[in-house]
Design a protein with these regions (language model features):
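N-terminal edge beta-strand
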Residues: 40-68
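Bacterial N-terminal signal peptides that target proteins for export
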Residues: 2-13
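Short, acidic/polar linear motifs in exposed loop/turn regions
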Residues: 77-79, 128
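Beta-strand signatures of extracellular beta-sandwich domains
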Residues: 82-86
């Protein structure tokens, strides 16, 4: 192969790669998921979880991939509790608000401590289907539940 043919091959491959990249960006914008930005007016689903008698009620939550979701945890007990999200919020954006105290580690949200009569809201958009267990990790509190994310 001579030098001229090699240059044309290199430029041809580069052009094809640029065209594929451009087309993938164009089609991706039409399929965008909701965001957490205040300007995004996508309606959200609200699910209230009561914490009472050392239980999460309801214990099983069902949400959909791509649906903006707000989980509202209300601690009705006279004692402190925690919400440990497991892998539910891994790799996605989320917002935490309310009277709970969020704790973070290198992987993201470790847990939220919920005082008696406290409330914490967690806003997120589920990205992957699956079953995501959550629990309270305080000593002696055997409380757990799960979020089922469906397509």
């Amino acid at each position: 192969m001579n030098r001229l043919t090699g240059k044309w091959t290199t430029w041809g491959v580069a052009g094809i790669l640029m065209a594929v990249f451009w087309l993938s960006c164009q089609t991706g914008s039409a399929l965008s998921l909701p965001t957490l930005a205040p300007s995004d007016s996508t309606p959200e689903v609200e699910i209230t979880i009561q914490i009472q008698n050392r239980r999460f009620e309801p214990g099983v939550l069902q949400v959909r991939v791509g649906q903006k979701t707000r989980l509202i945890f209300k601690n009705q007990d006279a004692e402190l509790h925690a919400f440990v999200p497991g892998g539910l919020l891994s790799g996605i954006s989320f917002q935490v608000s309310g009277t709970g105290a969020p704790e973070f580690n290198l992987k993201g949200l470790r847990r939220v401590l919920l005082p008696s009569s406290g409330q914490t809201d967690i806003l997120f958009v589920p990205g992957q289907p699956g079953v995501y267990p959550f629990f309270c990790d305080l000593p002696g509190h055997v409380m757990s539940g799960s979020v089922v994310v469906k397509e």
